[in-house]
Each structure stands twice: as C-alpha cells, then as structure tokens.
C-alpha cells in the first residue's frame, strides 16, 4: 500500500469527511449560521472586535448565506469540514486576518456541542408537542367518558 503524503487521504475523505460534510450542510447549516452570528455579537459587545470589523464580518456572513447553494456544494477536500468551509469563505472575502477573527475565543468543540444542543432542543420540542397533544386527547376522552362505567 502506498503512503499518501497530504491530508486528507482519499479513503478518509471519501468514507469519513465527505459524509460528515453532507450531514453538516443538510442538518446543521442553519445552526452554524446562528452560532456564528451570536458569537460575532459577543465579540463586538465585549470589544474583542471593533464595530467596523464586526460589521465587515457580518456583511460577509450575509453574503455567504445568500450566495451558497448547499445542494450544489460538494466536499472537495479543500477544507476539512463545514466549519472550515465557512472560515475559508470568510478569509477569501476579508483576508486571512479579519476572516479568521470570528473564531477568536471559541473552539470547534464549543460549536459542535452547541449545534448538538440546538438539534436536541428541536427534537425535544417536537416530542413535548406530541405529548401535549396526547395529554389533551386523553383528557378530552376522559371528560367525554366520565359517566361511563368501566367493568373490571
């Protein structure tokens, strides 16, 4: 077996990174966008970024969101994952220094955990809605049948 000198190895890219990229863009793109915007607000409000730089990053994020066609975007190996795809777009538009500043004071683990919590919240909310519907139906049925005899 020949050694592969660059990242990612084609097998790893095909079997791990490409499916992860597809999943991230399909299920988590909106969460990535919300996290980026919330983090940008924090960076500006704490003075880590000045208003002008924060504004330029916000405009670039708006442009990226408006221009990206997630259905057409495929994993190419140019970047490791969806996180780096957005970062690469910011750097392309704003330069490497300003484009990289959005990631000041956070880690990919922070982002991953936040995304998973956001996705879990959606599922919990849906389950709670179903439980409320079931509880209402059971209460309605109990009230409708309150004079019915139940034979044991």
How would you name each of these model-derived features?
Residues 1-152:
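A helix-coil-helix interface module used to build multimeric assemblies
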């Amino acid at each position: 077996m020949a050694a592969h000198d660059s990242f990612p190895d084609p097998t790893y890219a095909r079997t791990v990174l490409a499916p992860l990229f597809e999943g991230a863009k399909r299920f988590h793109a909106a969460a990535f966008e919300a996290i980026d915007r919330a983090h940008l607000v924090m960076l500006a409000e704490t003075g880590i970024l000045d208003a002008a730089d924060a504004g330029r990053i916000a405009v670039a994020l708006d442009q990226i969101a408006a221009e990206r066609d997630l259905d057409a975007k495929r994993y190419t190996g140019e970047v490791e994952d969806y996180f780096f795809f957005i970062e690469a777009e910011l750097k392309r538009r704003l330069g490497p220094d300003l484009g990289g500043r959005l990631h000041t004071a956070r880690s990919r683990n922070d982002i991953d955990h936040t995304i998973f919590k956001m996705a879990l919240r959606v599922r919990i909310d849906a389950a709670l809605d179903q439980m409320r519907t079931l509880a209402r139906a059971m209460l309605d049925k109990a009230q409708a049948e309150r004079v019915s005899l139940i034979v044991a």
